[in-house]
Regions:
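Glycine-rich flexible loops
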Residues: 2-11, 20, 24-251
């Protein structure tokens, strides 16, 4: 979702768009960085901010749209609602528990918190990236599943599904997303954008970038008049999945 663009760090912003229960303890019990956040959380916050800024620099979001989170233990650090990423500082650390109760910071968490928490509750994710990437969002309006235009769909677990549309920030959207993510590490959100997860923020981000690239590839190939793109079979994709298990450097 495109977060509200009002910079709420002065504490005067309301809680519009935050999920029920997410703002409990914002004034009482929620602690800013330095009065509860340990070194691990501080480092994780720095990486989260860098990743959020990267989504803007790489054109995956505009303004304050999209959101990023990372899990440390049973705490989820998440981008706040409506604050431009280039203005986020160490003092802006925002975190909730797995029930959505705010435990760090005074800024209102992203309105898409239900999606992030649903991913953490139902998968082994340690990081989540949600964007409004242009080509991926365009594809989400055209098909129910991204056609198998490239073998790197295997890196996301198989053919990428499109979660049916639901209003941003709702449990309905989170439920639709979970169904689309079954057996996958990423999906498209109809008329909305992308969501991916991984063991690290780098992995989640790379999956987002790969998904956007595949969507751009399919749109480009299918735009050629009189020709139809060659697609891969799921059997071919399974072969790639096997090879990817041994891909890269090993320690």
């Amino acid at each position: 979702m495109a977060e509200q663009r009002e910079d709420r760090r002065d504490g005067r912003g309301g809680h519009e768009g935050a999920p029920e229960g997410a703002t409990e303890g914002v004034r009482e019990g929620a602690r800013p960085r330095g009065s509860g956040a340990g070194e691990e959380e501080a480092r994780a916050w720095d990486v989260l901010v860098a990743t959020a800024r990267r989504t803007v620099a790489d054109g995956l979001v505009v303004g304050t749209s999209g959101n990023v989170s990372v899990r440390t233990g049973d705490i989820v650090l998440v981008t706040p609602s409506g604050v431009p990423y280039d203005r986020l500082t160490p003092a802006d650390l925002t975190a909730v528990d797995l029930d959505g109760r705010q435990v760090r910071g005074t800024l209102v968490p992203t309105s898409e918190l239900p999606m992030h928490l649903a991913v953490y509750r139902h998968t082994d994710a340690r990081a989540v990236v949600h964007t409004h990437a242009v080509h991926a969002t365009a594809v989400s309006t055209l098909v129910a599943e991204l056609p198998l235009i490239h073998y790197m769909a295997a890196a996301l677990g198989g053919p990428v599904r499109v979660a049916p549309y639901a209003t941003y920030g709702t449990e309905e959207l989170a439920e639709n997303m979970l169904r689309a993510l079954d057996g996958r590490s990423g999906c498209l959100l109809q008329n909305h954008g992308t969501i991916t997860y991984g063991a690290t923020l780098d992995q989640a981000y790379d999956r987002t970038a790969q998904l956007e690239w595949m969507c751009r590839l399919w749109l480009t190939a299918s735009s050629v008049a009189g020709l139809t793109p060659t697609l891969l079979s799921e059997g071919r994709l399974d072969e790639v999945a096997q090879r990817l298990r041994g891909y890269g450097q090993r320690s």
